[in-house]
Amino acid sequence: MSIQNNRLLVLASALALSPAGHAATFCATSTAELQNALDTAAVNGENDVVRVAVGTYPAPVGGPFDFDQLAPVNGDGLSLTLSGGWTAFFGNPCGFRSEAYNSFDTILDGEDRERVLRIIPDGAPDIVIEGITFFRGNPSEGGTRRGGGLEIRSANFTGKLRVERSAFLFNTADYGSALEAGGSLIRLRNNLFVGNDAVNSGVIEAVIGNGDSGIYLTANTIINNATQSSAASAQGGVYIFLWTDTNALLVNNVIQGNDVTDLKLSGEGNVTLRNNLIDVRVGSITTETGQITGDPMFVGGLLNFTDFTPDVGSPLIDTGIKPPALIPFPPPFDSNWGLPDYDLLGRPRTQGVTVDVGAYEALPVDVFSDGFE
């Protein structure tokens, strides 16, 4: 569930959300089961839902977890939802998932020997990833390596991608150390990117091609990502390329402490920033409102890599914005965004006056915690 935009035309909304066809559902409790589910999902002629039970899953020997709709002769080009956080219920090992799941409970581990997950879509499927931690991805193939945690190869992909309430920790690649993404519309919301290391450049690399719609980055925490390169173009932060007439909307993000540049924008598209804390930016910004500055003041110490909750006094607390409640149809690009109901640790998304900035929601301060009333 998520904080949804309430569209004025209910019928149009219902049509937009109606499924393309029957969905096949899989449950994975081991590396082999997960890869088998992805193999079947690529060719079975159905939209597919792959549920991953809570646990840690090493990447297969000799390659990443792989969803490839081009290699099989009969790849179906239909949609995939991959979600973590599932637990046993009445004999089904993937029978239940709380809406308040913890995104660090389901880990796909590249073990520093393989990319974690590669998705090669064909045509215009919807690709959705929820509640997965991508850990220690390191692609083993030769040539230019992209997307150490997750690679969405986009040459034949004209569908939509959504990555939500997921984490990318300690991945590496030449470009896009954590994520390489493409598609007609990309939504990255309420994710953590920390400790990833690019041989050349970028923790996230997203290219929005000619004729595509754009990219939404909403409520992400993207910090302390590195580059090994000393080249003038190298940087450890987010890289977005926009063709003419494409769009990027960045709302409620923390992008800070990344090597050289936190956000690098290229191309000729339209870029809107709202209520972000972004330190070092390069490139043209069309519109910016609600800029936040200063030390984000996270609760964790130097060895913390999973909890970046804003501490008391943080400029991130109650400085985010919510999606518009009413928008016209068809919705303008800058209004057509949303937020999950829960943060990365499974806490309700709004604790105070409004949402906090970043992937974590601070809990209310107990003014009587010292024992005096």
Residue ranges and their predicted role:
Residues S2-L9:
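Bacterial N-terminal signal peptides that target proteins for export
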